[in-house]
């Protein structure tokens, strides 16, 4: 038979089986009955016009069963009743409820089996083996929602085979134990739980139940699991189905992990009916994520060789489902979008479970496995060492050690259980992270290869959280209390609460959380009592309260007035004050009342400096603190200033002629206005005196006669009029031989130093004194001392290019000689090379462009030069050579200089301008440098003038352009005061005027090859070759240079030969030749001159001791010894307890803490009681379009319309793409949808035809479906005949597409498919 013919017969068969025979009588003619799967009865009746308050459906059995009633709301003329006995007789009565009482609408007696027979008789012409059974939404009782009406859909029955296949019945060859673990939490609800029961019954129906076949057990779980019946509780299928029917809904939370542990502990015991030889299957049905850990129990179940199937509904955690289920996951994990879809999953899941059992075969214990029945259990569970967060467990192991132990614990008052698996033969462990003061129920389960033994249980209570130790006041001020306490073990933070002792309301109590066992309470009132309490916290747990009453100190006067750093004109006064102080006033007055003053300091300071004061005077000092409430009492003290300090360390140095130089050390740091110096001979003669400024420390005293003793006196006058005590010494100018050094010579080694050399005088010199200062006399004079055995010294840290005056004198025991002097200017630049007299800077060395350093510089390459020993360095575009000015120029660049470079421009040199060498400021702005522009073939020198304005000079003559022709050229740029000269290959090319240059910066950067348009520290460079780059500190070097590096300009007389030259000219001397043959003996020469003295002989024996010589002169003072710290000595004895220290200052207020993290979501609350019925809702939305009405009479024929113009032919469309081949599953699904749509259309048309005169038109049916992608079917997993309704469940959720709405028309061959976008 063709596929089209089969489809027509199949649709005809389904259409004929849609209506059951109606009973006789006018009342019964308004009632229609239909039998649904599992002996449910669906009824529909017609409403009377003006329906009353509702309907009462009463189904009364003839005998035996209880009466079941269902009250429906208005406009719901249909209902479904389940749980009926198919062989018993029932009476069905339907009443309309009105204000005057119930009115009978319909009455009928029926037997389920008779209704089935009538349906089969009327469908004798249908295809054999198929039936159509109506299915309804879940059964709704009086408590169900009343906002929606039941609707009818028609599906293929799965109780009968399709196309002559026998009905599916699983009779496995080996016994099987199937345990259902059903989620009964609040999230399921009563209505959906009924659908879960239907789902369980659909699975159980397809298995052969019996003691030697398949046994079924069931456990329902929520907050705590409960075994509804064990495996051996029922012997027949009817008993099991009856138990499913009477299964009651529990409600509660979702603790799947605890339920799995319950299965291990209770349902898999031999006493529960588990057979060792039977295959074991666990089927878990849940609709939510577990609130406890499931991994441990799931792993043990799978290790026990138990096949775990998981069925998830709605928003379940798919990752958790895969964690629970056995392998392979595509068979054992199933997820449906809603509870009504469980009915369609049952046939497929039954076949998969059957195939799994059949594939396992009989279970046999492994070789060497010891079968224990009953399984041994440990004994004597002891719970000890209970702390606030832990309990120690110990037990006596069983005689036969298990593979592992499963430890489960939870609070006895309820809460999420936790579990852990302990491997190996252990008998103790410690449970941590527990809650304090909580009783725990602990279970220990041994796990064997053959199952789980009986649990060993015990109870223990954790200790309370330890409170803080005794509170202690560490510091007290008027505004703060510093409280400390011993820390508590296992505490994360402390809660500190404090309140005025006189307060009566708790609302004034303040609290603070701290992490350390101390707290500083601030913002308190002075002189008040406070009650302070502290609690230990660990998460939500709190300990008992530890309290203390403390009192803040009252405001008072300052204390402990002390004086320090007492000088002749000032002193520092300090005090202690209580906080908070706004202002402190300090006043002082001299003892005679002639001098007084006062000062004010902020309240956060505790000291002040008083001055100016008079020397050697006693002062009375008074300190007053001012608070918010006023001033404190006065604290008084006395202090006496010191004498004005006198100059010290006087020394005299004899100068040439009749003058001497007096030197002294000023003991006062500042304040000296003038020094008064007086000298007079002790015999006859007049006294003389001079005054010098207070900033000096030396003075020249003229007119002193030889061999005359003088008394020299000096005293200091201060700015406040105070005079120091005079200081004097006696000095006699002597004519004794105190010869000064001679031949004083100065030279400049570096720009910052001077080399001083002299010829020592005759006589024993103790040391030499070197005084040096600026020749202009504007700066201070400095002095150094040189040992008498040396005749040279180096003066360092000098300014470059600056003239200095240096004086050198010899110091004898009898005094100091006259000083010899000389002046010299420090160098502006260092020597260009160590053995060169030319001064300047070699920038090749400064930038590391030498053979030993270039390899570490990016973008630089080196190659030997054919012109000589100087190598050639190539700078590429990625070379970024930059150095700080201070690293290259230790001194300032002189205004007259010459820039010398030997350069070659390459073909890849950019055509834009680049700076061969330039100086930049800190902001990378050019200040001084040389630009080469290969595009314009010009050379530009630029600098800043004295006004910091940029000035530049450009050379673009023909002789200058040859620099850009690709050969090496030596270029000199001589910069003078008013002009710049350009030399190319040691020949003057041009001269340009330029203004005076400003001083180049001592900071900034120096770069090589930087592109002129570049900005910032990172920039590109030009590509060129460089052999030489120097700056000579002279503008005349270009006229002296001979350009020996250029072969065409070499002169054999002035230029040395290249050591590495391959060929030599006739003008250049060659290397020495080989040694010639020995010559003939010569004549005897004249007598030689007297030879040099021979080497020193060996020391002779010691001589006899000579007489004692005269006493030697006093030696010079030795150098100061260096103290070396010795090893640390042993600790000394403990000293006596010191006085109590001063109170610390008030700390600053801490910053406000960041908000804590959001807490975890609490567990779902218990379902509340059902509320009263609400008010009627607003009118519903507009309904669907009704069915088409009866055809009307033909209207009059209209006038013919005008003929329109002939349209242009359209363009030929493009050929469509080849369609993808569809799988058999997709074709079958489309055929099924089309068939069902046609049947529904015909049913609606039939109903409309039968009742078109009695009721308004009904809306046509619309169903929501999802278009999916084709998916191949594994024939190895689905070897049973699949029912048509099963194809949709083989498609996974991820294979389904967007929802579409299929509207069925009156023509079964026409279907309008509308996407969600087209419906808007």
From Swiss-Prot:
Among InterPro entries, the record links this protein to:
Collagen, ConA-like_dom_sf, ECM_Regulatory_Proteins, FN3_dom, FN3_sf, Ig-like_fold, TSPN-like_N, VWF_A
Region Disordered: what ranges? 728-752, 1064-1220, 1291-1320
Membrane as a keyword? no
Per the record, where are the segments of Gly residues compositional bias?
Answer: 1106-1115
State the GO CC annotations.
collagen trimer; extracellular region
What are the Fibronectin type-III domain coordinates in residue numbering?
27-118, 377-466, 467-556, 557-644, 646-735, 740-831
* Glycosylated residues in this chain: 433, 569, 604, 771
Residues in VWFA domain copies = 177-352
The record, for CDD domains, names: FN3 (cd00063), vWA_collagen_alphaI-XII-like (cd01482)
Q: Which residues form the Laminin G-like domain?
A: 840-1035
Its localization reads: Secreted, Extracellular space
Extent of Low complexity compositional bias: 733-748, 1081-1093, 1140-1152
Q: Which domain of life is it from?
A: Eukaryota
Domain (Collagen-like) spans 1069-1122, 1125-1174, 1165-1221
Protein known as: Collagen alpha-1(XX) chain
- Give the species: Mus musculus (Mouse)
The protein's gene is named Col20a1
